[in-house]
Regions:
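Short, recurring structural edge motifs at helix starts
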Residues: 1-5, 14-19, 41, 139-145, ...
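Short amphipathic coiled-coil heptad-repeat segments
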Residues: 1-21, 185-219, 386-404
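A short glycine-rich beta-alpha junction/loop motif
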Residues: 9, 92, 108-114, 143-167, ...
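Non-catalytic DNA-recognition/assembly elements of restriction-modification systems
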Residues: 15-39, 213-237
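Extracellular/lumenal glycan-associated surfaces
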Residues: 19, 167-179, 183-186, 222-224, ...
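Short, charge-patterned binding micro-sites
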Residues: 27, 105, 208
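DNA target-recognition patches
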Residues: 30-33, 43-74, 230, 234-266
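A short beta-sheet element
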Residues: 56-57, 67, 71-133, 149, ...
Length: 404
């Protein structure tokens, strides 16, 4: 690819394939085609028992929950507009601008809510798909309207190169999208594998042993009161900004300035905040949906959190990583959380309540193996997530530089 000098004020992208130098042409989508949609389908024409999927705006891009008869489908497909293979279907309401490539399956789409541009051979669909991912629809900027009308589509500006260059650009992004999709599938598979292991490696339904365990371990897990294993840490700051401020979230523990993108929202006076030493737990003690996340400080030797976030550590008989997974994924904590809910919508999990919970716990060596296993699995998942995020950022950069 050749990079174009920024000083050259021409209708060309910053980055393009070698051999292409002509200006891109400015057009409106309405000059290149017209908006098409399927014939209206009424509710009494749909059923869960018919043969042909009927996609409404709520199921567009996912699984259908309504179907039409084969006879009606064939009649309407013959008489009224119907997409061709490769056409880019667009959501015109709800989440405006979502796209699905029509692959040729027998299926029908809700009129006016799902549309496509019926265009001539001046437009390449692969190129058009990528354009849709960055387009600013005419007339919708700053609007609160949640509908994309035909006029919005037809009046939208587009800059296009030759069809040969369009095809090269479209193929480039198609390969990149395929790579992103492959990494997404790998990531999803790892997450599913973790979910399966979590279900099998902790006892459930009153059992004293898990369904799946490491070789060499056969003893029953024993019931223990968690308070026998965890120790509250009550040290508080004595001066302002004594240590970095943490945010303990459902996605992990973060420096607050990173979590809020450069801003620190804690009180300017954080004297009296709880101190969190490295390796210690902290968590938000209240929840509206029975979900609590117990985060371990692996960011700094010391950090601080609001007094709404208790701090504790484990003694030498309980592996902290093992405990973290058991609290997040074990059935005992979910049941215990439900018991703490006393009217209203909010559940409070004070540390003294947590200390009263009864857990089935294996010997320390087995704890360590379980904790290490899931930690390694999480690190693998995080690595795949970083790769996926990088690919998405690379695509974003290419889109900015390869379109006018």
């Amino acid at each position: 690819m050749a990079k174009i000098d920024d000083s050259v004020k021409k209708k060309v992208p910053e980055l393009r394939f070698k051999g292409f130098t002509d200006d891109w042409e400015e057009r409106k989508l309405g000059e290149l085609g017209s908006v098409a949609m399927n014939r209206r389908i009424f509710k009494d024409q749909t059923s869960e028992n018919e043969e042909v999927p009927f996609f409404k705006i709520g199921t567009f891009g996912s699984k259908p929950d309504a179907f039409i008869s084969r006879e009606l489908f064939e009649e309407y497909k013959l008489k009224y507009p119907y997409p061709e293979i490769g056409d880019i279907l667009i959501s015109a309401s709800g989440s405006i601008g979502r796209t699905v490539v029509y692959q040729g399956e027998d299926e029908y789409f809700q009129d006016s809510n799902i549309v496509w541009l019926k265009h001539d051979d001046r437009l390449n669909n692969k190129f058009l798909k990528q354009f849709y991912s960055i387009v600013k629809w005419q007339g919708l900027e700053g609007s609160t309207i949640k509908r994309l009308y035909n006029k919005n589509i037809l009046d939208t500006d587009i800059s296009i190169p030759s069809t040969i260059e369009q095809n090269k650009i479209g193929m480039f992004f198609e390969r990149l999208d395929d790579t992103i999709a492959l990494h997404q599938r790998k990531l999803d598979l790892l997450k599913e594998q973790k979910k399966g292991y979590l279900q099998k490696m902790f006892p459930k339904n009153g059992s004293k042993i898990p369904e799946l365990r490491f070789a060499g371990f056969a003893d029953d897990w024993e019931e223990h009161k968690l308070g026998d294993y965890i120790i509250q840490y009550s040290e508080k700051t004595k001066q302002n900004n004594q240590y970095p401020v943490f945010t303990s979230s459902r996605n992990g523990l973060f420096f607050q300035k990173d979590y809020y993108k450069g801003n620190q929202i804690a009180s300017e006076d954080n004297i009296g905040y709880n101190i969190v030493p490295r390796g210690y737990f902290t968590y938000r003690h209240m929840s509206d949906d029975l979900v609590f996340k117990f985060n371990i400080n692996d960011l700094a030797d010391y950090g601080i959190v609001s007094t709404l976030y208790p701090v504790f550590t484990t003694n030498e008989q309980l592996n902290s990583k093992y405990l973290q997974y058991q609290l997040h994924e074990g059935s005992e904590f979910r049941r215990f959380s439900l018991l703490q809910k006393q009217g209203g919508s909010r559940t409070y999990m004070y540390l003294n309540k947590l200390q009263n919970m009864i857990l089935n716990i294996p010997k320390l060596e087995e704890q360590q193996k379980i904790g290490s296993f899931f930690q390694q699995l999480d690190e693998t998942i995080a690595l795949h997530q970083r790769k996926l995020d990088l690919l998405k950022e690379q695509k974003k950069g290419f889109l900015q530089k390869m379109f006018v």
